[in-house]
Amino acid sequence: GAGDCSTHELPGFPVLDNPYNRALPVFLWTDAVDHGKGMNEYDGIRTCDQGIFDDPKDITLNSNIKMIFNLASNTLVNQHGDINRTAKLLKDTSKCEFIVCSDLFMTASAKFADLLLPGVSMFEEENITKPWKFTEFLGFNNKVIEPLYECKTEYEWIRELAKRIDLEEEFTEGRDYSQWMRYIYDDLRTREPELPEYDEFREKGIYKFEEGHYPISFEKEVKDPEHHPFPTPSGKIELFSTKLWKTPMKDFMPPIPRYVAPPEGPEDPLTKRFPLQLSGWHSKCRTHTVHDNNLNLRKLDPQ
């Protein structure tokens, strides 16, 4: 992970209210599949309006996860820890009973789908390209060809599904995909007036923001601590976390930062049976698994 130091807002579809009003860390979805019922705030369970600095009380899940929509993501298996455990969980159909996956390739995650739908590539749809955390630009992805072999974007097939259950108007709000693109961009321009008109941006394909002031971490807290306290119980920088000390996780997450031996690490008794440890890495020629099978890039940057 990395901290966000972007100085501009980025576009995105509006998010609907979650009627269940529970959220969990993405890396703990496997626990929620296996033993979700009863998971609580110490497992990272929050209401949808709470953040990492909130102090929730008596927040629990009342059910295990039984169905997963895995769209444009390889997080089910490939981009997750302990994939052997994850695969074992997914093979047990008494746990997660139905998985919907939309993807371009038969990824490690797609192999576990009960319903596998072919997605469209970046060459077959229009989209707005956003930077990851740091770079100050927006790009426009212009469609090169129409989707092949009756493939549909996620928006299209979810719209068709919504229509069959009489929720099309609530889902689309009267806009098709291209109208949503324009609406989202124009809405962003009300807060980022530096951006050009939508049609100009679409034609040029990229816009780089003018260089401006970059955020300084905790600037407000340092300059005006009275009105901008730190998000801690004391409102100050804490070397000892009283919040962690009061939790049942204090041995695994100590209130004073210190080294905690990881499971299956060099101190684990398992090393007597398995003395070798494999650490994987990947080079700059791929992003996660994207381009891992690109032979031309492998020649340029062997791994």
Each model region followed by its residue ranges:
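A glycine-rich phosphate-binding loop feature that marks nucleotide/adenosyl-phosphate handling sites
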Residues: G1-T7, G174-R189
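Gly/Ser/Thr-rich helix-start
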Residues: A2-D4, F13, K236
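A cross-kingdom feature strongest in bacterial/archaeal respiratory oxidoreductases
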Residues: E9-L10, D17-L148, Y183-Q303
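Alpha-amylase-like alpha-glycosidases and glucanotransferases acting on alpha-linked glucans and related
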Residues: V144-E160
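Alpha-helical structural motif
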Residues: E154-W157, Y177-W180, F274
